[in-house]
Regions:
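Bacterial Sec-dependent N-terminal signal peptides
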Residues: 1-25
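N-terminal, active-site-proximal structural segment of metallo-dependent hydrolase catalytic domains
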Residues: 5, 21-83, 94-102, 176, ...
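Active-site metal-binding loops of divalent metal-dependent hydrolases
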Residues: 32-34, 161-163, 196-197, 299
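Short, solvent-exposed loop/turn elements at domain surfaces
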Residues: 36-45, 116, 168, 226-229
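Structured beta-strand-rich core segments of catalytic domains in phosphoester-bond hydrolases
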Residues: 66-155, 159, 258-263
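Active-site neighborhood of phospho(di)ester-bond hydrolases with catalytic His/Asp-centered motifs
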Residues: 68-70, 91-92, 192-196, 217-221
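His/acidic metal-ligating clusters that form di-metal
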Residues: 141-161, 168-209
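Metal-dependent phosphoester-hydrolase catalytic domains
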Residues: 169, 182-191, 199-307
Length: 307
């Protein structure tokens, strides 16, 4: 009888193990340049303390599972984390490898993922320490995480960066360096690379990322694309661009169901604005002029992916 129970227990465990290994991991992956906190933005009405809760609501509504942020200072990341129950993040400051300067942080839902390993490296000839690489004008950092999808037991790699806005050589070399690091940290694993690359889909460093076949642009491989604008808006709600400077790249073993540029906006009150009434609406309905604003000077991009 005991032998029978043992055999049954082993059979059940084996079956569960097979089921978990066969189960697909379906995830919402995003990239969001949240714009660094600065006085000029506050004067213009785009201050971080106004934008932060709106950013958090957007993230929660669209159900980001894992997302990379760019430009955030430590206090911004802590405020965002406080507004996102059930999320944690990893990533260090680019100036000192601790807290100073902008971060390329990775946020993830703790109910869906377990952080297995993580780290950071600089986009330079000396990636193991804070440094400026090649012809860049600022130190640039890439943070990475190895995450286990709790339901399926599958693991994935996630890289997030912010490339230099001036250095052309730096962007190309950074693209090569990141691909080298991907092989070091878990070749063969489903891999995501998010970030503000400071170049659109027509530039050489973009081509460097997809030319080897190790990465695909999710915009090009998604079954469905919803992208009514580019990804940089400069806080202009009336502007349009075809340039995608924020990207989500995926390894070939990741299937992308859909891709979207989320052009959500919000409104702030205008001084002395008078309510308008329309003959086409009930009399109790008034429309009050407000200023349209974007939660950041970049739109977030998000994909639904499976592996």
């Amino acid at each position: 009888m005991n032998k029978l129970r043992t055999v049954l227990a082993i059979t059940v465990l084996f079956t569960v193990s097979l089921w978990c290994s066969a189960q697909e991991a379906v995830v919402n992956i995003a990239s969001y340049n949240i714009r660094q906190h600065n006085t000029h933005d506050s004067i213009q009405g785009n201050g971080w303390n106004v934008r932060c809760p709106i950013l958090a609501q957007l993230i929660r509504y669209h159900e980001f599972d894992v997302f990379g942020t760019q430009e955030g200072f430590k206090h911004q990341l802590e405020q965002l984390k406080a507004a996102l129950p059930g999320y944690d993040y990893t990533g260090v400051g680019r100036e000192d490898g601790i807290d100073a300067g902008e971060h390329s942080a990775i946020f993830y839902r703790t109910d869906k993922f377990t952080l297995v390993d993580h780290g950071d490296f600089w986009l330079s000839e000396t990636p193991d320490r804070p440094s400026i690489g090649w012809d860049a004008v600022l130190p640039r950092i890439c943070s990475w995480a190895r995450l286990k999808h709790n339901d399926s037991g599958k693991e994935m790699l996630f890289f997030n960066l912010h490339m230099d806005h001036i250095g052309k050589q730096a962007r190309i070399e950074s693209a090569l360096l990141v691909q080298k690091k991907m092989k070091e940290f878990g070749e063969g694993l489903p891999t995501f690379l998010t970030g503000d690359f400071n170049v659109d889909q027509t530039h050489r460093s973009y081509a460097t990322l997809i030319s080897t076949g190790a990465l695909n642009d999710s915009y090009l491989t998604a079954d469905f694309v919803y992208a009514l604008n580019g990804t940089f808006n400069d806080y202009c709600t009336d502007c349009f661009s075809t340039s995608r400077i924020d990207h989500i790249f995926v390894s070939p073993n990741v299937k992308v169901d859909k891709y979207g540029v989320l052009t959500d906006t919000y409104r702030t009150a205008e001084p002395d604005a008078e309510p308008n009434y329309s003959a086409n609406a009930p009399e109790e309905i008034s429309i009050i002029p407000h200023k349209a604003r974007t939660p950041s000077d970049h739109f977030p991009i998000v994909i639904r992916a499976r592996f």
